[in-house]
């Protein structure tokens, strides 16, 4: 089981960029509410649309992508991969039946699965 962290919609863009994204070398994050419910995905590239002097007063919820249906635990890698491509994100949230974020699929984890399948199938 891998560690994953989320950010709060109330977090400032400055906190997301300087305290989450750059230290973790992760340019996107899943946004949740206080109960762990999925809210959206925030991207450093979208922070670039906001003047940097406003980063400390602009919330992640103001710039996050909200039009996503999070993945369920029963979904296949192919289903999640298609949604990631459609959304233009490198990460995708996975939620339980109550809508709480329980994990994150990354583009790198999908590459790892595909490479593993190729190796085990003699590809």
PLM features per residue range, with description:
Residues 1-3, 16-21, 38-92, 97-123:
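Tandem CBS (Bateman) regulatory domains
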């Amino acid at each position: 089981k891998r560690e994953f962290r989320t950010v709060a919609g109330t977090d400032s863009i400055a906190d997301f960029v300087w305290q989450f994204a750059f230290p973790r070398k992760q340019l996107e994050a899943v946004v949740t509410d206080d109960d762990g419910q999925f809210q959206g995905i925030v991207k450093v590239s979208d922070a670039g649309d906001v003047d940097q002097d406003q980063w400390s007063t602009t919330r992640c919820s103001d710039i996050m992508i909200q039009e996503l249906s999070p993945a369920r635990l029963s979904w296949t890698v192919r289903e999640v991969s298609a949604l990631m491509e459609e959304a233009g994100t490198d990460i995708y949230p996975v939620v339980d039946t109550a809508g709480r974020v329980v994990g994150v699929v990354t583009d790198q984890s999908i590459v790892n699965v595909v490479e593993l399948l190729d190796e085990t199938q003699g590809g």
